[in-house]
Structures are given as structure tokens and as C-alpha cells.
Regions:
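N-terminal signal peptide c-region/cleavage motif recognized by signal peptidases
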Residues: 12-16
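Mature extracellular/passenger domains of Gram-negative fimbrial/pilin and adhesin proteins
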Residues: 17-176
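Sec-dependent signal peptide recognition
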Residues: 1-8
Length: 176
């Protein structure tokens, strides 16, 4: 069985506004069904692609403010989100909604960094970096949701016993 654990930070505070934000997710962990020998054999020498998983992050703040989400992992390898020692997770954010309006995403490197990239409906999540929410310019909101898609793959190898591969996604809310 392959198991992906999602660890989520639940509170963030803005020092300037003394406003509290709460982070929730539709799922705290994602399990993949056991990968059968036939599936691994069919993949040959190529990595085994696991079914894409999807979950939603929700942020609720006491007052409207700029919200940025930053992503880390306790299981990182070569600057990527690792899945065990022979796999990786590719994470994409999309379908962002802030206070009942669709918004675009922009990758950001740090909490106070200016926005320099183009906005898009989808954004690839980079380890130890984040996303900001824009509609022309960075928006202020008290309610926010964003869908994360997790596409995982693992190196094909002979497995004789039950093996659990662990991945981890840590999400931090920052209100710059």
C-alpha cells in the first residue's frame, strides 16, 4: 500500500492586524490502493504513475487581508516533494476562489516578496515556495479556497513485502 500523509498547519497570525486565520482541508491523508504486480510489470522500466488525487484547502480569516500559502515537506528529496525514497509528488493548485469570486494564482518565493510572475488559473507548487491570489493585483479576502491536485509516481522496483511509501505536504498560511 502506498500512503501519502498530508500534514497541515492550522493557524496563522498577522502581527500587524492581530487577525487569526484558520486552515482546513477536505482530506488529512491520501491513501492509494495497493499497486499490483501486474501494474508494475506493465510499466516496465518506467516510473509507475499513481492515480491523481485531489483535495481542497480552505482558509478563513477574521478580517479581510492578503493571504499567501506556502508549501513545505518533511520528506523532500532533490528540491522536490518526495514519495518514499524512490518516488515524487507533483502538486498543482487551481480553481481558486476568494470571497465568492474566482481569482488567479501567482507563485511567490517569500511572504513579503513582490509579485513578479504572470497570473494563471493553475500554478505548479514548488517546494518551500508559495502562491498569492490576484485579480489584477493581490487581493484581500477573508474566505479562500483552492484545489490541489497531487500526481504521484514511484520508481518501479521489485517489492516482495508490503511497503508503505510516505509523502508529506505542509501548508502554512501567511498574511503579509
Amino acid at each position: 500500500m502506498i500512503r501519502l500523509w498530508l500534514g497541515l498547519s492550522l493557524l496563522a497570525f498577522s502581527g500587524a492586524l492581530l487577525t487569526e486565520c484558520e486552515l482546513n482541508s477536505t482530506q488529512r491523508s491520501v491513501d492509494y490502493l495497493p499497486v499490483r504486480p501486474a501494474e508494475r510489470q506493465q510499466a516496465g522500466d518506467k516510473p509507475v504513475a499513481l492515480p491523481e488525487k485531489q483535495f481542497v484547502l480552505y482558509v478563513h480569516c477574521d478580517k479581510p487581508q492578503r493571504i499567501r500559502l506556502f508549501f513545505g515537506s518533511a520528506y523532500a528529496q532533490n528540491g522536490r516533494f518526495a514519495l518514499g525514497n524512490r518516488g515524487e509528488m507533483n502538486i498543482t493548485a487551481g480553481q481558486a476562489v476568494a470571497d465568492d469570486r474566482d481569482v488567479m494564482l501567482v507563485p511567490v518565493r517569500s511572504a513579503g516578496a513582490p509579485i513578479t510572475a504572470e497570473a494563471a488559473k493553475r500554478s505548479r507548487i514548488v517546494l518551500n515556495q508559495g502562491i498569492a491570489f490576484v485579480q489584477g493585483e493581490e487581493i484581500e479576502a477573508s474566505q479562500l479556497s483552492v484545489v490541489l491536485n497531487v500526481a504521484s509516481m514511484m520508481e518501479n522496483q521489485a517489492i516482495t513485502d508490503r511497503v508503505t511509501y510516505r509523502g508529506n505536504l505542509q501548508v502554512r498560511v501567511v498574511t503579509p
